[in-house]
Regions:
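Intrinsically disordered, low-complexity regulatory segments
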Residues: 1-188, 486-490
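Basic, low-complexity terminal or inter-domain segments flanking catalytic cores
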Residues: 2-5, 24, 88-91, 95, ...
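OB-fold/S1-family RNA-binding modules
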Residues: 48, 108-113, 247-264, 628-634, ...
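Short, conserved phosphate-binding/catalytic loop or strand-edge motifs used
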Residues: 149-153, 298-300, 319-329, 333, ...
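Metal- or metallocofactor-binding catalytic centers and their adjacent structured scaffolds
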Residues: 167, 258-295
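C-terminal helical "lid" subdomain and adjoining coupling/linker elements of P-loop NTPases
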Residues: 201-208, 219-262
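C-terminal accessory/connector segments of nucleic-acid motor ATPases
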Residues: 230-247, 278-319, 325-328
């Protein structure tokens, strides 16, 4: 008998575990083990109609609003193996075979050890217990915790494998299971949104609503509306300027105070300016100040920095995950904002090599002691995002993990190295006018850039202009009055930086959760948003979603934050999972009538429904009389080939024509055929029809090649 069956989340993790422990099976420090792995989630909830008693199935199948909200007590929460389509072959495959394989491999083991990712959301725990239940495992279950897939971390976790007395005593599982059930129940909101939209006459496929996605969409819509409705209101204000271009102005504590000195008419400002004369500058004070490097970036910050370079959320998420599995960077789904003391000293010897790869001057890396703004003496789960212990030889080679690979490593590495740079030093200068002391100036003069020469993440992730307040040169001797033309502040356009900063400010989700959600709602035919080089805009469906969720719980920032707090309480045994699920029913009950009412606003924002219908360009037609005297019309282009006048005449005469086209892969392909009447979805039409052997011959040649 083998003592431990170690269950990893995916094949890449199993490979790293095998490397750390000495093989896919064997013995490590007196304990025999065998490594098995999943391929992510293998189980999923069955459809709502299959979750409930037979006499209620029709009700739960229906999308009619009269059947909402659902009764949580009706649900069995049954799961089944996932049936997924292979994107390359198009074939569907059930995960049942994976479960069978795992069950066969662990049957002779004494205990099953959960070694899935230690995710802050508890997703790894949920994934593992789904498998444990599916294979009907009845022996002991244990947990191996690890910070990352480095050998040191895996070995430390193996030495400290912890028992789990029962599924219900695993807080991470309870949290993730309750969250997945809440999200399943939120499907009702998608049904509401889709139904009321179709009833209003808009031809949507589905309007997706959900825990974080609805908040994101609504917030982007609100900001885009502010931008759209912005009207510039100029004002004129008297200020002073010296000959070194330093501006002296009154300091206002609020807009009401500022309004007293900001004139709507330029002539009024000129009248005020006539009261002033040139004034000497006095009370000049200079203070030497310094600022430490900004904190380490989370995944949402990283993605928002890379978005303007053309790397979308899905690309960054996918590539970072592959680089983590190769030990190039740290664990992506971390909730930590600092690293541990041990992690700091583990990377310290690698600093010269990391600096060489990203072309950072090593003479700047002189701060070799832990900064307690970045390093904690306490414990961390994974530690903040940072370079891994495997240093790549070159940046260019990282493109094998994804096109954003070099850019990801460059930002992550430089951000980490900035911590080892000295503080930025600058002189903070203040002064005022001798004759008009209420007119003051303040600016910073850089003395030593230090860490800013390595990487300044605060400037990289900011969605506002931070150059204001920095100046060069000495103050002048005197300053003269002038009329400054300003305007009410223009709202910031919605960008990925702006959105991620907002969510981070309210501590909603981990960095990886934010990026993952954005990736989901910007992909596919039912996308709610579009992201182009960091700029965010809504699709028609996204606009519909935003309008429908105005005033709802599902799109509320405070409600979303509260919901995530409740989920954490489930994980720490402070809240029963059933109590969390009642909030899903409360949300649907509250939001349903609001969304129905909001549907009346769609026309005002979107126009008449037909304007949303996608109009495809008309295809070029040709035609004439066939040999039987029938007048026909057919497409002049087939497979990218445009029929010549002679080919059209031959087709009408019933003759066969031959020509070359290119396949989707760009390979040449010979085609021959005739004009024929055909049927597609019950509709009869005339068009070119390739001979039966055209595609048959191609299939045979492919088989031979194989």
């Amino acid at each position: 008998m083998t003592e431990y069956a170690i269950l990893c989340e995916k094949a890449s993790a199993a490979k790293n575990f095998a490397s750390a422990l000495g093989g896919t099976s064997g013995e490590f420090e007196g304990h025999s083990y065998k490594i098995v792995h999943s391929h992510g989630h293998l189980m999923a909830f069955v459809d709502p109609k299959e979750q409930v008693p037979d006499d209620k199935a029709a009700q739960y199948r229906s999308w009619k609003l009269e059947h909402l909200p659902w009764q949580v007590a009706d649900f069995s929460w049954e799961k089944q193996p996932i049936m997924a389509k292979n994107p390359r072959t198009g074939r569907k495959k059930s995960t049942k075979s994976d479960l069978t394989e795992i069950k066969k491999n662990v049957k002779d083991c004494d205990a099953l050890v959960i070694a899935t990712d230690v995710d802050p959301s508890g997703e790894g725990e949920l994934l593992a217990w789904e498998i444990i239940n599916a294979i009907k495992w009845r022996k002991p279950v244990k947990r191996l915790y690890f910070a990352d897939e480095e050998a040191r971390s895996i070995q430390a976790g193996f030495r400290d494998i912890k028992p789990i007395s029962s599924q219900q005593s695993d807080g991470d599982y309870l949290k993730s299971d309750a969250r997945s059930k809440w999200d399943f129940l939120s499907m009702q909101l998608t049904r509401i949104a889709t139904t009321v939209t179709k009833q209003a006459g808009y031809p949507v496929k589905v309007v997706r609503e959900g825990r974080l996605k609805s908040l994101m969409v609504r917030h982007v819509h609100e900001q885009a509306t502010l931008v759209k409705n912005y009207k510039r209101k100029a004002f004129y204000e008297v200020k002073f300027q010296d000959n070194a271009k330093h501006v002296f102005a009154r300091q206002f504590k609020d807009d009401e105070t500022a309004a007293k000195w900001r004139h709507a008419v330029k002539a009024d400002a000129a009248t005020e300016m006539a009261q002033y004369h040139n004034s000497a500058i006095t009370n000049v004070k200079t203070a030497r100040r310094h600022s430490a490097p900004p904190k380490l970036l989370d995944l949402s910050n990283l993605a928002s920095i890379l978005a303007p370079k053309g790397y979308n959320a899905k690309e960054v998420l996918s590539t970072y995950q592959k680089m983590y599995e190769a030990k190039i960077v740290s664990y992506p789904r971390t909730d930590d904002s600092k690293i541990s003391m041990a992690q700091f000293y583990q990377l310290l010897p690698l600093v010269p090599a990391i600096a060489r790869v990203v072309n950072v001057d090593q003479s700047l890396l002189t701060h070799r002691k832990p900064r307690f703004t970045h390093v904690t003496t306490g414990s961390v789960d994974h530690g903040a995002n940072r370079p891994g212990e495997k240093v790549p030889p070159t940046l260019a080679g990282l493109s094998k993990y994804g096109k954003s690979g070099p850019a990801i490593y460059s930002v992550v590495a430089k951000n980490y190295l900035a911590m080892l740079g000295e503080d930025y030093q600058f002189d903070h200068v203040t002064a005022e006018l001798a004759d008009y002391p209420s007119f003051k100036t303040a600016f910073n003069v850089p003395v030593a850039l230090n860490y800013k020469l390595i990487f300044d993440s605060s400037r990289q992730i900011s969605d506002v202009d931070e150059t204001q307040g920095e100046a060069q040169g000495q103050l002048g001797q005197t300053a003269a009055p002038f009329i400054f033309e300003g305007a009410n502040k223009k709202p910031v356009r919605p960008t990925m930086k702006w959105l991620m900063n907002y969510l981070q400010h309210y501590n909603i989700g981990t960095g990886a959760t934010r990026v993952s959600t954005l990736s989901q709602i910007t992909a596919g035919t039912t996308a709610l948003m579009k992201e182009r080089r960091g700029a965010l805009s809504l699709t028609d469906t996204g606009t519909i979603s935003a309008i429908l969720t105005e005033g709802t719980i599902i799109s509320s920032t405070n409600a979303t934050k509260r919901l995530m707090t409740l989920m954490d309480q489930v994980g720490s045994f402070k809240l029963h999972p059933d109590e969390l699920l009642t909030t899903a029913t409360q949300t649907v009950t509250h939001d349903l009538p609001i969304m129905v009412k909001n549907a009346d606003k769609l026309k005002a924002s979107l126009g008449e429904p037909e304007k949303l219908v996608k109009h495809y360009p008309k295809k070029a037609k040709t035609g004439g009389q066939t040999s039987t005297g029938k007048e026909v019309s057919f497409n002049q282009v087939w497979g990218g080939h445009r029929f010549t006048t002679q080919e059209v005449a031959d087709l009408l005469a019933g003759k066969e024509v031959q020509f070359q086209i290119k396949t989707k892969r760009g390979k040449p392909m010979a085609v021959h055929g005739k004009l024929a009447q055909q049927t597609y979805r019950g509709h009869k039409f005339w068009g070119f029809k390739p001979a039966d052997d055209v595609f048959q011959r191609r299939t045979k040649s492919r088989r031979k090649a194989r």
